[in-house]
Regions:
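Conserved ATP-binding subdomain of kinase catalytic cores across diverse folds
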Residues: 1-95, 100, 127-132
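Residue-level signal for well-ordered alpha-helical segments
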Residues: 3-5, 34-41, 57, 101-112, ...
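Catalytic cores of nucleotide-sugar-dependent glycosyltransferases that transfer UDP/GDP/TDP-activated
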Residues: 33, 53, 66, 119, ...
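Short C-terminal domain-edge/linker segments immediately following a structured domain
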Residues: 68-72, 110-114, 177-184
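Short, surface-exposed, charge-dense and proline/glycine-enriched linear segments
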Residues: 71, 91-106, 163-173
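A broadly tuned preference for mixed-charge, low-complexity surface segments
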Residues: 78-80, 89, 93, 124-137, ...
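Conserved kinase catalytic-core segment
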Residues: 102-161
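C-terminal catalytic region of ATP-dependent kinase domains
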Residues: 143-241
Length: 241
């Protein structure tokens, strides 16, 4: 799968989103055709991680907007084709000012939604494969029917992965056993050749990312299992055994 490159059309940027790196909606030109896209100005390695992981998810069959490498007056930007629907937080009206009890109810509702998607366990395994350190409710897109996975800049060892958020949502939704079983199966089935089938432009080298994911895929099922510790796991070592 080829990473396409494009250019930013001047004076078309409109602020959108509330993420760590403020994104804009803008018009980009790719292969002579104009498209609406979400564009981010982030460090180069984060741009490349976004592009690589976005394509990798697509090769693995997960719904992810196409990533585009943007050249803009000497700067390299990240863009993804605009899916046209909001993230889960916006769709459900989440904000930090609502009472804690309401936040917990919304979080449970969000967890139920994510765990209802047929590919959520596969996405959980894929997040483990790329060491996704920034999955959150703002980077699931959902329009009430269709969904997509976005935001993969804090991956591939560029940022610590302290948790697997989809695994945590599964626990919150009471679906831990179901997602654990499906996640282990997905980890064993992920195509190990997928990273090598991503073709970057001539100026881009993805070899470090390819090697990283290849290493992550070794023992991936075990790492997925470790995201769902059992009571015996939690107590191991306490009695010296």
């Amino acid at each position: 799968m080829k990473l396409r490159a494009g250019t930013l059309v001047p004076n078309t940027e409109t602020p959108v989103g509330d993420g760590v790196n403020a994104a804009v909606r803008a018009v980009i030109r790719v292969d002579g055709i104009s498209h609406l896209a979400i564009v981010k100005r982030i460090p180069l390695q984060a741009v490349l991680a976004e592009c690589f992981c976005g394509l990798l998810f697509r090769v693995w069959g997960l719904p992810t907007p196409e990533p585009i490498l943007i050249q803009d007056n000497g700067d390299v930007l990240f863009a993804s084709m605009d899916a046209g629907y909001p993230n889960l937080k916006k769709r459900l009206g989440w904000n930090d000012q609502i009472p804690e009890g309401q936040q917990q109810a919304l979080l449970k509702f969000c967890a139920d939604i994510v765990c209802s998607w047929t590919d959520s366990a596969q996405a959980m395994a894929a997040d483990e494969a790329i060491a996704n350190g920034d999955r959150n409710l703002g980077n699931f897109l959902w329009d009430g029917t269709e969904h997509a996975y976005i935001d993969h800049e804090r991956t591939l060892g560029l940022y610590p992965q302290r948790a697997n958020i989809i695994a945590e949502l599964a626990k919150f939704a009471g679906k831990a056993d179901e997602i654990e079983r499906a996640g282990v199966a997905a980890a064993l089935m992920l195509d190990a050749s997928a990273p090598t089938r991503i073709t970057p432009p001539e100026s881009v080298d993805f070899s470090t990312f390819v090697t990283y994911v290849a290493q992550q895929l070794q023992g991936l099922a075990g790492r997925v299992l470790a995201r769902f510790p059992k009571p015996t796991d939690l107590l191991s070592g306490i009695d010296g055994s």
